[in-house]
C-alpha cells in the first residue's frame, strides 16, 4: 500500500452515509468506524480519500441490507490539494466495497475515482472507468 502524496482532509465522519459506486447490490453505507485511525480520546473517527472503514449497509438488495462491510472512500465533497497545486473536489461522497485483501467486491465502478486511490489500491484502479 503506497502513501498518498496529497494532503487529504478527513471529512467523512462516523455516521456519515455514503453512496456505493459499485455493482455489489448495496446502494447506501453508513460509517461505523475507521480502520487505522489514531485520534485523541473522545474524538470521533474520520476518514478521507483512500481510507478503509467499516460500514453498515442501509439501502440495497435484501441480501445486502443490514450487513457489516469494509469500504474504501473513492470520492469526497471536501476539496483537497495535490502537490502540483491543483485542488480537487467531487460532487458526492462515495465508496467501494472491498474484501479482506482490499480487492473490490464488485466488477465495475460507477463514476470517477480519485487518482490517489487508484495508486494506492491497484485493483480498484484497474476496475475504475474514469480516474481523475
Curated annotation (Swiss-Prot):
Signal peptide: none annotated. One of its GO terms (molecular function) is structural constituent of ribosome. GO terms for biological process: translation. Pfam families: Ribosomal_L14. One of its GO terms (cellular component) is cytosolic large ribosomal subunit. InterPro entries: Ribosomal_uL14 (IPR000218), Ribosomal_uL14_arc (IPR019971), Ribosomal_uL14_sf (IPR036853). CDD domains: Ribosomal_uL14. Keywords: Ribonucleoprotein, Ribosomal protein, RNA-binding, rRNA-binding. Binds to 23S rRNA. Forms part of two intersubunit bridges in the 70S ribosome. Part of the 50S ribosomal subunit. Forms a cluster with proteins L3 and L24e, part of which may contact the 16S rRNA in 2 intersubunit bridges. Belongs to the universal ribosomal protein uL14 family. This is Large ribosomal subunit protein uL14. It comes from Methanocella arvoryzae (strain DSM 22066 / NBRC 105507 / MRE50). The gene is rpl14.
Amino acid at each position: 500500500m503506497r502513501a498518498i502524496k496529497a494532503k487529504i482532509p478527513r471529512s467523512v465522519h462516523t455516521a456519515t452515509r455514503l453512496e456505493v459506486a459499485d455493482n455489489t447490490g448495496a446502494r447506501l453505507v453508513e460509517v461505523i468506524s475507521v480502520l487505522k485511525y489514531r485520534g485523541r480520546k473522545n474524538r470521533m473517527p474520520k476518514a478521507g480519500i483512500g481510507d478503509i472503514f467499516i460500514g453498515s449497509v442501509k439501502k440495497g438488495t435484501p441480501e445486502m441490507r443490514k450487513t457489516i462491510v469494509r469500504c474504501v472512500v473513492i470520492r469526497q465533497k471536501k476539496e483537497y490539494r495535490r502537490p502540483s497545486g491543483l485542488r480537487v473536489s467531487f460532487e458526492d461522497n462515495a465508496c467501494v466495497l472491498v474484501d479482506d485483501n482490499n480487492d473490490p467486491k464488485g466488477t465495475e465502478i460507477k463514476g470517477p475515482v480519485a487518482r490517489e486511490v487508484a495508486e494506492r489500491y491497484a485493483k480498484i484502479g484497474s476496475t475504475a472507468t474514469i480516474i481523475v
